[in-house]
Amino acid sequence: SMDHENEIIIYTHIGDNWMIESDANGWETYSELPRQRFEHQYFDDTNLIKNMVFDLQVPTIGAMPGPGFHWDSAMLCDVTICTEDTKIEVPHAQGGLVPGDGMGLMFQHYLGTKKGNYYMMTTRQVTAPQMLEWGLVSEVVPKGKAVERAWEIARMWKRMPYENRCIMSNLAKRPLMKLFMEDLKLHTVSEQYASLLRVAEGTLGDENSAQQDEKYISRVNDYRYATKDMEQPMNFELWDGMPKRAGEWFKKVESGEIENPYVFEHSNEPDWYNAF
């Protein structure tokens, strides 16, 4: 944001997907509780989201090349493009957590209160056609064309006077600015407080959770995005059996029976994964 030679920003991800390859060790850098978790969630997470809207004074285009989690950063751009295979979700509740890191707030904002609450609280996935119909994205394009389309739009905007396209971008960001001023901090603190309660109880990552102390989520995410299980209305059987099905699915991957399209080095899964 401080580099004034940046005139238009395309926000995307390397490869065919959107930030789907989890780092099994990624949480170790701030796993000390409670100070580092507080600093990460209360300061870093909140500011990362706010900076996308308040600090970037030039037009922004989110280009999603495929499915993945923490899609909220792409939705914070002035215009968002996704490919036809993209799907998104707010998975927190199924892992026993509160969805307060921005994704739940985005669902409420773009889908409306009732529909947003439903998809947030049941963890059901939203597909690309639904994302377009419900106003989460601006366009849906064929696989491999998201960045190409983003560049085309950027070249169009480049024809405008610099000052005018910056002012236009400010107007585009206004609804999210007002939303974040009212609710973002409350959402962030709510997830943080609920997580710390589970840590204090010793239940974060228990046998009823899809999430094992936050650094073991890689395999579960791969399963959720590689199958269509999460696209259908959730029932108790689907909800309760998801961790077990993820383990069974990955055993088939390891045996070569099926292919994991989201290959990543999963080195730190807990022992209970291997029991299925």
Residue ranges of each PLM-predicted region?
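C-terminal alpha-helix plus adjacent terminal tail
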Residues: 2-5, 13-20, 25-26, 123, ...
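Alpha-helical segments flanking ligand/cofactor-binding loops in enzyme cores
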Residues: 51, 71-72, 105, 117, ...
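Glycine-rich beta-to-alpha active-site loop
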Residues: 47-95, 125
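Short acidic-hydrophobic, aromatic-tinged amphipathic segments that line or gate anion-handling sites
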Residues: 81-82, 137-149
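Short, high-confidence coil segments that cap the C-terminus of an alpha-helix
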Residues: 4-7, 77
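Extended, non-globular alpha-helical segments
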Residues: 18-19, 24-52
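Hydrophobic/aromatic residues within transmembrane alpha-helices
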Residues: 11, 23, 59, 73-75, ...
